[in-house]
Amino acid sequence: MTKVALYKQDGTQAGEVELADSIFAIEPNEAVVTDAVLMQRASLRQGTHSVKNRSTVSGGGRKPWRQKGTGNARQGSIRAPQWRGGAISMGPIPRPYAYKINRKAYRLALKSVLSDKVSAKNFVIIDELNFEKPSTKAIADSLNKLEATKKTLLVVDDANENAKLSARNLPNVQVTTASGVNVYDLVKAQKVVIVQSAVKQVEEVLG
């Protein structure tokens, strides 16, 4: 079992937490992580790009001049692709870019990134984040004491609404729940700060 330090909300160490080696101590598979990141980035694309082709561009129903006798090249419409203001041939049309990879591969990618964060000591476990009311200042103080001052992914349990509301105004902090942990967010974050109860939820899902 891999052991990681457990911290309190005030930044003091409260003990250690044992993590499952099958999730947090595997050999990272960079190829699978890359596939997972590309898949997530592709799903973020809107795919709303569109141009007008011969059937949608307006005008051009009349032949600009007769077929023969003018000395000009034959033309059938002023909206043909070679004309200025004409239609676009083989241009982009709206389409979804999203695709899926195998669930087994995605789970391996999650384990790979989590293992990399743990081995690099960029995985911080906190016993709890309790606030009587949402407070950006309070959660910023807690993260500063944990030395999570740069790009940080804060993972809380699903029921911790005050922590989610407190952290959403911090520019370098992205907050998510244990059920919403994904490869792209983990890769982007320099440090992961996770509540102990959320660790158990992650282990239940990936175990």
Curated annotation (Swiss-Prot):
| Alphabetical list of Pfam families matching this protein | Ribosomal_L4
Which UniProt keyword terms apply here? Ribonucleoprotein, Ribosomal protein, RNA-binding, rRNA-binding
| One Gene Ontology term from the biological process aspect of the record | translation
Tell me, what is one Gene Ontology molecular-function annotation carried by this entry? rRNA binding
InterPro entries tied to this protein: Ribosomal_uL4, Ribosomal_uL4-like, Ribosomal_uL4_dom_sf
Lineage: superkingdom: Bacteria
The segments labelled Disordered in the record are 45-77
Please list the residue ranges that the record marks as compositionally biased, kind Polar residues: 45-57
Indicate the family of this protein.
Belongs to the universal ribosomal protein uL4 family.
**Subunit info?**
Part of the 50S ribosomal subunit.
Q: What does this protein do?
A: One of the primary rRNA binding proteins, this protein initially binds near the 5'-end of the 23S rRNA. It is important during the early stages of 50S assembly. It makes multiple contacts with different domains of the 23S rRNA in the assembled 50S subunit and ribosome. Forms part of the polypeptide exit tunnel.
The molecule here is called Large ribosomal subunit protein uL4
Organism the protein comes from = Oenococcus oeni (strain ATCC BAA-331 / PSU-1)
Q: What gene is this protein a product of? A: rplD
